[in-house]
Amino acid sequence: MEIKGINHLLFSVSHLDTSIDFYQKVFGAKLLVKGRTTAYFDMNGIWLALNEEPDIPRNDIKLSYTHIAFTIEDHEFEEMSAKLKRLHVNILPGRERDERDRKSIYFTDPDGHKFEFHTGTLQDRLRYYKQEKTHMHFYDETAF
């Protein structure tokens, strides 16, 4: 048995309509179906589901670095950054980043789920770490 890929992403949200608006405007997600407490989207081939659960505490998740990163092209970075600002999206302070690690912008949805738009690839990151992070052990040299 082997994993074929990611099947879908599901996020618990406090207000379904607010979140639908966010995912449509920020990610260009295409709304496929909406129920009383559920919405399904197609996000460029990714199945995204939202479940409204208004009574779940959401305060402490902001302390975690857990996030989902989406690839964007380097030439689209400034445009995407401007779009997030124009939509008044909560943009997070990014970490110090070496240019070899490419560009990233971190932000949250209305419920605090963290996302990143990143211009680099896994291979970019591995090459950079191989040069700079001498304490790391690399197991698969063919990965980059």
Swiss-Prot record:
It is found in: Cytoplasm. Keywords: Antibiotic resistance, Cytoplasm, Magnesium, Metal-binding, Transferase. Belongs to the fosfomycin resistance protein family. FosB subfamily. Metallothiol transferase which confers resistance to fosfomycin by catalyzing the addition of a thiol cofactor to fosfomycin. L-cysteine is probably the physiological thiol donor. It comes from the Bacteria. It comes from Bacillus subtilis (strain 168). Residues 5-120 form the VOC domain. GO terms for molecular function: magnesium ion binding; transferase activity, transferring alkyl or aryl (other than methyl) groups. Its cofactor is Mg(2+). Its main location: cytoplasm. This is Metallothiol transferase FosB. It is an enzyme of class 2 (transferase). Homodimer. It holds the Pfam family Glyoxalase. The active site is at 116 (proton donor/acceptor). Mg(2+) binds at residues 8, 67, 116. Induction: Expression is sigma W-dependent. GO terms for biological process: response to antibiotic.
